[in-house]
Amino acid sequence: MSVILSACGKKEAKIEYGKVDCDFCKMKLMDNKFGVLMISDKGRNFHFDDINCFKRFQEENNISSKEIHISCTDKPGELVPIETAYFIHSDNIKTPMASGIAAYSSEEIANKTAKELQSNILKWVDIK
């Protein structure tokens, strides 16, 4: 008799840059400083290459999310819950789909960058 054990731990949220396409604009996600991962209530992963694609997808589709994670400019490729990120909007920020919005995991770095760009820090509730 053999026994099979499986781990029941939560999988780490991650985006496979260069391998997945944006579920809104259909372009391949390439820049690991930007990207959104939405996990639906049914467990399906939706990928977006820019926060604007994510916002427009939400406006056009009635899909409930269980989790939403965003890649941070100060830690490329690392995803954080979108509610904990700090955002800066500036025409000087070059993003995949020209939203000009970048997420940061650190309030200190976001403050420094906002000052350099003469911008303000926003939270997710301010831009969603």
Regions found by a protein language model. Give the residues of each.
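C-terminal partner/receptor-binding element of secreted or periplasmic proteins
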Residues: A103-K128
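Bacterial signal peptide processing site
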Residues: G9-K11
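Charge-dense polyanion-binding interfaces
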Residues: S64-F87, N92, K123-K128
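Post-signal-peptide N-terminal segment of Sec-exported extracytoplasmic proteins
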Residues: D23-I63
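Short aromatic-glycine-(Arg/Gly/Cys) micro-motifs in beta-strand/loop hairpins
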Residues: D31-K42, V80-M97
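C-terminal motif of bacterial Sec signal peptides marking the signal peptidase cleavage site
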Residues: I4-A7
